[in-house]
């Protein structure tokens, strides 16, 4: 079996870090969260403030990134999923994520995660998920049935299962 691990909020719990970054970014532009949510995303900010331009959203993402860089300790390594990487090693493990590559590399360095063969950056649309399965089969010279994905996103989990892929659903850590 070959193990494909999602990074953002599966291997590394990032809800608190991500939300803190967006709260900081909102405050920098004299805005605030409209309600309490487990994880603030760009899409949620767009829903709260539809008048924001694409430039404003990019600016906020930049402010969030600066916050994240100096608050990596707010993230937490998922010991169960990290054990999969250390047990099976780089010959049998790869990572995938829809998150910002720079942020992912910072998180991996911060948590000293090195036991993987490759990282595939994905937008995790249904089409791209199908391509990712093919890419991982090429990487490991295996059949789709030999892949096991670790993922927290229910839509991604459902699509992988529709493709007949084994998936270990990982629940996000409750924010204290």
Question: Would you name each region that the model predicts?
Answer:
Residues 100-148, 154-159:
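Substrate-recognition "cap/lid" segment bordering the active-site pocket of phosphatases
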Residues 11, 93, 149:
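Conserved SAM-binding loop
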Residues 1-38:
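Active-site neighborhood of HAD-like aspartate-dependent phosphohydrolases
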Residues 83, 133, 153-159, 167-176:
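Short glycine/proline-centered loop/turn elements that form peptide/ligand docking sites
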Residues 1-5, 27, 55, 146, ...:
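Non-catalytic pre-domain segments flanking phosphatase-related domains
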Residues 69-95, 101-105, 127-131:
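Short, acidic loop-to-helix structural element flanking the phosphoryl-transfer center
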């Amino acid at each position: 079996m070959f193990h494909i691990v999602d990074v953002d909020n599966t291997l590394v719990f990032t809800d608190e870090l991500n939300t803190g970054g967006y709260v900081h970014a909102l405050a920098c532009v004299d805005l605030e969260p409209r309600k309490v949510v487990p994880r603030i995303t760009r899409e949620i900010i767009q829903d709260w403030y539809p008048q924001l331009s694409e430039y404003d959203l990019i600016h906020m993402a930049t402010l969030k990134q600066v916050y994240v860089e100096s608050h990596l300790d707010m993230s937490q390594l998922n010991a169960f999923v990290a054990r999969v990487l250390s047990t099976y090693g780089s010959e049998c493990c790869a990572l995938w994520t829809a998150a910002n590559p720079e942020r992912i590399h910072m998180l991996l360095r911060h948590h000293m995660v090195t036991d993987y063969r490759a990282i595939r950056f994905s937008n995790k649309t249904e089409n791209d998920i199908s391509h990712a399965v093919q890419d991982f089969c090429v990487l490991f010279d295996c059949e789709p049935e030999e892949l096991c994905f670790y993922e927290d996103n229910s839509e991604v989990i459902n699509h992988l299962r529709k493709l007949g892929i084994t998936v270990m659903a990982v629940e996000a850590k409750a924010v204290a």
